[in-house]
Regions:
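N-terminal segment of the mature soluble domain
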Residues: 50-54, 58-128, 176-182
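C-terminal/domain-edge helix-coil "capping" segments
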Residues: 19-70, 136-143, 154-198
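Sec-dependent bacterial lipoprotein signal peptides
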Residues: 1-19
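A short, acidic, amphipathic alpha-helical segment used as a generic capping/interface helix at domain edges
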Residues: 128-136
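Generic short beta-strand segments
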Residues: 149-153
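Residue-level detector of alpha-helix boundaries and kinks
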Residues: 4, 40-44, 80
Length: 198
């Protein structure tokens, strides 16, 4: 009798533990990255795509309206002035990739300069064939610097919440420090807190 009662107790404990313990995401499926999906009130992939699309179109329109050679651009350090984590590098990469693929822009990799300088030293050390060795003096010089910043405000009253983002991009002429192009994208999202019942 005691053995049966002990077995029942253990079985009940295991069942309750399985029901009440933490649950893991064990099944998933691929979705369309262009579909809008808002799971919470944070910056998400859809917001990034809206900003990128606006900036890409605006920059291409600016270049098309000017009789200038293919501009050479470097990127500023991205600035996130919101209270949440936003992957600004992912946003920059999204914009940069589309502009390069358009064939209208040339981007220089400022982040690789130190590694390239070290590679120059190695290739000039005698280990590399002279006719293939690369060295300083042939790098392109950027004419423009592209920068971006995202700010946000949050308003909450009762169960209602409004989140507002403003993304601003600009191009600065390195020779003159003149801001030659700028544009903004504003995003407002509304949320309502749902009560959780049992």
């Amino acid at each position: 009798m005691k053995t049966w009662a002990l077995g029942l107790t253990l079985t009940t404990t295991l069942i309750l533990s399985a029901c009440g313990g933490p649950r893991a995401f064990t099944r998933g499926e691929y979705g369309d990255p262009n579909e809008i999906s808002m799971l919470d009130d944070k910056w998400n992939q859809n917001d990034m795509q809206l900003v990128a699309k606006k900036m890409i179109g605006s920059m291409e329109g600016w270049i098309d309206g000017r009789a200038v050679e293919k501009p050479v651009v470097i990127l500023e350090v991205p600035r996130n002035r919101t209270s949440e984590h936003i992957d600004m590098q992912a946003l920059y990469d999204h914009v940069k990739t589309a502009l390069i693929q358009s064939g209208k822009f040339t981007f220089l990799d400022k982040t690789a300069r130190q590694e390239i300088a070290e590679e120059y030293e190695y290739q000039g050390s005698g280990y590399v064939r002279e006719d293939e060795a690369q060295g300083p003096g042939n790098q392109r010089g950027a004419r423009y610097m592209m920068g971006g910043v995202i700010t946000s405000t949050v308003q909450q009253v009762g169960s209602q919440k409004v989140v507002y983002y403003k993304a601003t991009f600009e191009w600065t002429d390195i020779a003159t420090t003149e801001i030659v192009w700028t544009d903004q994208k504003e995003i407002t999202t509304h949320f309502k807190k749902q009560s959780i019942g049992f």
